[in-house]
Regions:
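Conserved ABC ATPase signature
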Residues: 26-30, 34
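Hydrophobic anchor residue at the start of the ABC signature
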Residues: 40
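A short, proline-enriched helix->beta-strand linker immediately N-terminal to the Walker B motif
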Residues: 45-49
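Catalytic Walker B motif of ABC-type/P-loop ATPase nucleotide-binding domains
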Residues: 51-54
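H-loop/switch region of ABC-family ATPase nucleotide-binding domains
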Residues: 86-87
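A short, surface-exposed alpha-helical micro-motif characterized by mixed small hydrophobic
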Residues: 92-94
């Protein structure tokens, strides 16, 4: 690839994750949410058929969490297959097709989104959701 093509693709990806105005900045000059969106853009640069996310919002300030989740919702709406480890249950309810609920390193429940959020089978999942979801 030529430099011009690489720069063009990079800018298009930064635009896709909403941080094109920060293209000239170094990582230390970006917020945690912006750094996470750069990481998503880097992943997208490989034209993947699926993306894996391990707690993508865990180290972020509460105000930055939605910036990252909004990008991930958009990716899901565009058809990107994603496997996401998260405690963000509202996000999971919005974009998941299937939920695997882990408890103490073991699968406690494996269900379709509607079943998991509607009527979880395991007592542990019921307890977790009652504490985390705001009805």
């Amino acid at each position: 690839r030529g430099m011009e093509e690489a720069v063009g693709k990079s800018m298009a990806l930064l635009m896709r994750v909403g941080i094109e105005t920060h293209a000239h900045k170094f990582p230390g000059e970006l917020s945690g949410g912006q750094q996470q969106r750069v990481a998503i853009a880097r992943g997208l640069a490989m034209d993947p058929i699926a993306m894996l996310f391990d707690e993508p919002t865990s180290a972020l300030d509460p105000e930055m969490i939605n910036e990252v989740l909004d990008v991930m919702v958009k990716l899901a709406q565009e058809g990107m297959t994603m496997m996401v480890v998260t405690h963000e249950m509202e996000f999971a309810r919005k974009v998941a097709h299937r939920v695997i609920f882990m408890d103490e390193g073991r699968i406690a429940e494996d269900a379709k989104k509607e079943d998991f959020f509607g009527k979880p089978r395991s007592e542990r999942a019921q307890q977790f959701l009652s504490k985390i979801l705001h009805h």
